[in-house]
Each structure stands twice: as C-alpha cells, then as structure tokens.
Regions:
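Membrane-embedded alpha-helical bundles that constitute the cytochrome b-like, heme-associated redox core
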Residues: 1-152
Length: 152
C-alpha cells in the first residue's frame, strides 16, 4: 500500500489531481460563459458573441467576488498544473528529457500570468456596463451552480 505522500512524489499524480480539480470549475466556466448565454429565455435573450466580452466576467467579479476568485484561481492554477504535467508526460513518451523544476517554474509563471489578467478584469468591476446588460449577465450566472443558490 502506497501512502499519499509517496504517491504525491510521482509527477503524474499531480497532473491527475489537477485534472480532477479542473473538471468542475471548467464546467462552471463553460456553462456561465458559453452555454447559458445561448438561451432564448428572458432576460438572457441570447447574448450575442459580441456581448460576451470581458464585461461578462467583470460583472460576475463585481457581484460575487469571493466565488469568482475561488473559481478563477482554481481554473488558472489547476489548468496550468494539468497542462505542464501533460506536456512533461508527452515529452517523456517521445523520449525527451524533462526537468520537473523547469516545468514547475513554467507552470507557476503561466498561472501567475493568467491570474494577473484575471485581476485586471476584476478590478474594473461593472464599470461602463449598463444596468440592463448587468441584469442579462446576472441571469446567466443565476442559472449555474454555485451562483444559483445565492441572492444577487
């Protein structure tokens, strides 16, 4: 029987954990930003792709900052870890040497850049977004858990 600490030393274990953590947050992200906005119900009324810009995300940060930061931090960190682990696995299969320290450094850098971009979106809040558009955007959020259980 292998302890969790011994399993954690295996580089592939981290990639599997990151992939497992990525599934629910990626599903929430896709539902809120792609699937739900296509609905033809009021007040969403099929948000067009031109209306699904960064203001869609920034309104979410303005209304639910704790949840949004949790989801987007998980998305960035788990996504970067999963991508870097998968890249190393592919490189090993092709017979290339991999240096895990460089992979970890690159993953941290990638996650940091993604979070910096997320911070830039979040700091603007709902500035410049009309109240009607904010209501349409929040209707999208209210269709998806965890936002569906909150009052907004």
């Amino acid at each position: 029987r292998v302890s969790w600490l011994e399993a954690a030393r295996d580089a592939g274990w981290w990639q599997k954990v990151a992939g497992t953590l990525l599934v629910p947050v990626l599903a929430i992200h896709v539902c809120v930003n792609r699937l739900v906005p296509m609905q033809d119900s009021m007040p969403i009324m099929q948000l067009s792709p031109s209306e699904l810009d960064m203001s869609h995300v920034s309104v979410g940060f303005a209304r639910h900052p704790m949840i949004m930061w949790g989801i987007y931090t998980s998305l960035c960190v788990a996504g970067a870890a999963h991508i870097m682990g998968g890249g190393a696995k592919i490189a090993r299969r092709r017979g290339m040497q991999t240096r895990i320290s460089y992979g970890v450094l690159a993953g941290v850098g990638l996650a940091g850049m993604l979070l910096l971009g997320t911070y830039t979106i979040a700091k603007n809040g709902a500035t410049g977004v009309s109240s009607l558009m904010q209501e349409r955007i929040m209707a999208c959020y209210r269709e998806v858990w965890p936002y569906s259980v909150l009052r907004s």
